[in-house]
């Protein structure tokens, strides 16, 4: 720990020296030394597994409130919706053996200056972006420059930092077609593994950071196809069709998506970050049978189930990132944002009944996350990953 802070201090010292040194002839040597220090810090961070740890109480609370951040959606604004307890927002993630620094918007903007970042996924990916927007708004307010008719895909621009932030809606990452019977939608989907969802695939060449997530839409009947041929289904139990587990079907999808990105010839220097599964915490029923999540404190590590389907899904996501890394093509990098263990411990962080459910009375939200709340730690993780890669970008071209 002392060595970590010593290295950080040296970095700031030499950054100042480089900027204000009166001897331009020494600039090259100073930059080389600064680069070495940055790499030293990177190695220091890499010795620590940020995603293995526990939650510790932090009475400072969140870096924003539902008053200071005006962009919190009503469905995640648990305090505005009447949630009486505030303790769930007063915890921080503590990795084993090191510290996870709080999110710093200034550092974030320096890393992403002139870049485009896209969060590609479902409504939980949107939840992640909403947390990031609140954290960034203390430094710079964005301009909303695009919104589709359903407000699912959006783009914001931060002019001072020349940074573009996008959230791109997709259910499965690959092309999906909902089955229609007698003119009515069924909630059953055909997934085509050899075709990407164009909502994000068409935008990929303009993206520098792609934050992917997937899984929640797999918990239903879905049919998988490859080159027009059915290769299996989830929850169908039909004769003549191969039955697939959720995790194995998801692994097929993640594999083809990562391969697609790796083979993208028009893409920039792209860092792809796969965010692992964000678990739901319905107790005493499912989402449509009265299930709820009314805890007010985190769980300990010994209280979570690492043999659960949630963990299996997380494991195949990590496995696929490990598979693609050794074969990553030039200008492609792959990382994992491993939030599953941390979030398995946070059944207290969901809106539950405090989500303003005017149209769905009696249904609780134990999938998304209150804001502020434990989801803010995802951005602590994210900036740590970005910082690691920024330190190696001197030679990444």
From Swiss-Prot:
The intrachain disulfides are 48-98, 69-134, 78-370, 293-366
Output the Gene Ontology terms for molecular function: O-acetyltransferase activity; xylan O-acetyltransferase activity
Q: Which UniProt keywords apply?
A: Disulfide bond, Glycoprotein, Golgi apparatus, Membrane, Signal-anchor, Transferase, Transmembrane, Transmembrane helix
Name the domain of life this protein comes from.
Eukaryota
* Localization terms from the record: Golgi apparatus membrane
The record places the active site at 123 (nucleophile), 365 (proton donor), 368 (proton acceptor)
Gene Ontology cellular-component annotations: Golgi apparatus; Golgi membrane
The record, for Pfam families, names: PC-Esterase, PMR5N
Q: Which residues lie on this side of the membrane: Cytoplasmic?
A: 1-3
Residues in the Lumenal compartment per record: 25-397
Topology with regard to the membrane?
Answer: Single-pass type II membrane protein
Transmembrane feature ranges: 4-24
Q: Sugar-bearing residues? A: 66, 162, 182, 294
Write out the residue ranges of the motif GDS motif.
121-123
Where is the motif named DXXH motif mapped on this chain? Answer: 365-368
Gene Ontology biological process terms in this record: xylan acetylation
Q: What is its EC number?
A: 2.3.1.-
Family named by the database record: Belongs to the PC-esterase family. TBL subfamily.
Biological role? Xyloglucan acetyltransferase that catalyzes the acetylation of fucosylated Gal residues on xyloglucan side chains. Predominantly catalyze 6-O-monoacetylation of Gal residues in the Fuc-Gal-Xyl trisaccharide side chains of xyloglucan oligomers.
What PANTHER family has UniProt attached to this entry? Answer: PROTEIN TRICHOME BIREFRINGENCE-LIKE 9-RELATED, XYLOGLUCAN O-ACETYLTRANSFERASE 3
Give the protein's recorded name: Xyloglucan O-acetyltransferase 3
Q: Which gene encodes it?
A: XGOAT3
């Amino acid at each position: 720990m002392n060595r970590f802070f010593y290295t950080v201090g040296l970095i700031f010292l030499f950054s100042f020296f480089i900027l204000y040194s009166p001897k331009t002839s020494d600039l090259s040597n100073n930059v080389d030394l600064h680069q070495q220090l940055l790499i030293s810090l990177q190695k220091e961070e890499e010795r620590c597994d940020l995603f293995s740890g526990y939650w510790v109480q932090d009475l400072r609370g969140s870096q924003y409130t539902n008053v200071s951040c005006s962009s919190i959606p009503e469905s995640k604004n648990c305090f505005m919706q009447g949630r009486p307890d505030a303790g769930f927002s007063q915890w921080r993630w503590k990795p084993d053996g090191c510290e996870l620094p709080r999110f710093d918007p200034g550092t974030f903007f320096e890393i992403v200056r002139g870049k485009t970042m896209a969060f590609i996924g479902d409504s939980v990916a949107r939840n992640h972006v909403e947390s990031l927007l609140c954290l960034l708004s203390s430094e710079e307010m964005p301009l909303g420059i695009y919104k589709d008719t359903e407000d699912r895909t959006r783009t914001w621009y931060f002019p001072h930092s020349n940074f573009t932030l996008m959230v791109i809606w997709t259910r499965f990452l690959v092309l999906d077609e909902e089955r229609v019977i007698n003119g009515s939608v069924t909630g059953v989907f055909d997934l085509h593994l050899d075709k990407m969802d164009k909502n994000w695939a068409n935008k990929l060449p303009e993206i520098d950071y792609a934050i992917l997530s997937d899984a929640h839409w797999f918990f239903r009947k879905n049919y998988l196809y490859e080159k027009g041929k059915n290769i299996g289904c989830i929850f169908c139990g039909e004769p003549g069709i191969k039955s697939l587990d959720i995790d194995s079907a998801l692994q097929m999808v993640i594999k083809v998506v990562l391969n697609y990105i790796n083979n993208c010839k028009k893409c920039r220097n792209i860092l792809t970050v796969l965010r692992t599964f964000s678990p739901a915490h319905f107790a005493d029923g499912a989402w449509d049978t009265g299930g709820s999540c009314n805890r007010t404190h985190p769980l300990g590590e010994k209280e979570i189930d690492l043999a659960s389907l949630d963990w299996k899904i997380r494991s195949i996501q990590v496995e696929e990132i490990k598979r693609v890394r050794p074969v990553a093509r030039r200008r492609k990098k792959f990382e994992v944002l491993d939030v599953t263990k941390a979030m398995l411990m946070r059944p207290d962080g969901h809106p539950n009944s405090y989500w303003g459910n005017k149209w769905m009375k009696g249904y609780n939200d134990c999938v998304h996350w209150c804001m502020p709340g434990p989801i803010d730690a995802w951005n602590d993780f994210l900036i740590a990953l970005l910082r690691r890669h920024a330190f190696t970008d001197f030679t990444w071209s």
